Amino acid sequence: MMGGASEHDEAMKWFLQRCNGGDVLVLRASGSNGYNAYMYSQLGVDINSVETIVCNSPDASFDPYVHQQINQAEGIWFAGGDQWDYVSYWRNTPVDSLINLAITERNIVIGGTSAGMAILGGFYFNAKNGTVTSSAAMANPYTSRVSVDSTSFLTVPFLDDVITDTHYDNPDRKGRQITFLARILTDWGIEAKGIACDEYTAVCIGTDGIAQVYGDYPGNDDNAWFIQTNCELDLRTPEQCIIGSPLIWDRNETALKVYNIKGTNSGTNTFDLNTWTKGNGGEWQNWYVTNGTVNDSESDRIHCQPTNTESIDLDIESFNIYPNPFHEGSIVIEYNGTGPEVIILSSMDGTEVLREHQPGVYSTILTPDKLPAGIYMISLQYRHIIHT
C-alpha cells in the first residue's frame, strides 16, 4: 500500500517478488500503461508479464477478457485515480468477485497507490461526493463529503476492520481519518482501525501479518501511521459526533493510540497487525480532537487486555441457523435482541472462510462459495468479544 506521488522502488520490488515470477495485472480507470515498463524491466525483478487494463466505464466489469486476465494474474495492482470510479465500476460485479476469489483461493499479491490504496480496507472513504479536508470533516462529521462506506467490496487479509488514508502529509489528513473512525464507531458501533501513509511511503503486509514500512527516512520525513481506539479506556466513543457540530473525541487526551513509523529504504521498521500492540522502530502517540482540532502527545505502549476469550451475556432470546447440515446455497442466521457487529464463518482449524459486517440487524444470510465437506463454526462478534 503506497501513499501516493511516485512509487517507492524497494516497496515495489517487495510486491513483485511475491508474484513468484508470474503475471502482474494493473487495473485503473484512467491514465495509461506507464507501469508496464517500470514493473517489468526497471526494477530487476523477474516476472512473466505486466499488463495494464484501463476500465473507462462500468461496462468493462463485464468484459470476459478482463475476467480472464484477473484469473491468470499472480499480482494485481490498483493505480491512483478516483476511488469512486473504482467503487462504482467494480463493486458488486464480476471484477470484485473474481479478485476476492483470487485472494482467498490463489493467495495472489494485491496492492495499490493513492486511490488504489484507499479501496483496500473493509471500510473505505468512497469519495462519491468528492474529497474532504481534515478541517471540513472535523467541523461537521456528517457533511455529505464524509462518505464512509462499509458495503462489502475487497476482502484483503488483515484489513477487514481497517480504513486507510493516503497523501497523509499533503495536505494533513489526520483529522479526516480520525473523523472516519469516529463515524464508524458512532454509526456502526465498530472500533475500526486506521492505516495511513505519507506520500513516497509504503506499507507492505506479509502473510504473517507483519507490516514493513518503506520510505526514504532519514533523508525525507516519510511516515506510516497505525491508528486505533484506546482499548485502555472504559468509554471510547467520541464525546460529540453529530450533524452540524465540530467533532470532540478527547477522552482525557487519550482517545486514540497511534504507532508512528518512519519508512526506511530497507523496510526494517515494522508493526504487528495480528495484535496491534507490538511494533519495532516506531513510537507510540496519543491523538485526540477538541473542537475540531487534532492534538497529539507522546504515549507509552498500548496495553490491551485480551478479550477474544471473554464470555458475554448476550441479549439473545433465540438463535437459529439453518439449514443444518448445510450443503450449498445460503445459510440463514436469525437472532432476537442485539445483533452482532461482525459474523465470521470459519473451519475447525480456525481458517476464516467468510466475514460479514452486521450493523445491528436481526437476521442475515451468508452465501459462501463452495466449501469442502467438514464442520464449520459461526462466530458473532460484539465489539472485541466473540461468541461462537
What is each model feature region?
Residues 79-80, 103-124:
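Catalytic nucleophile loop
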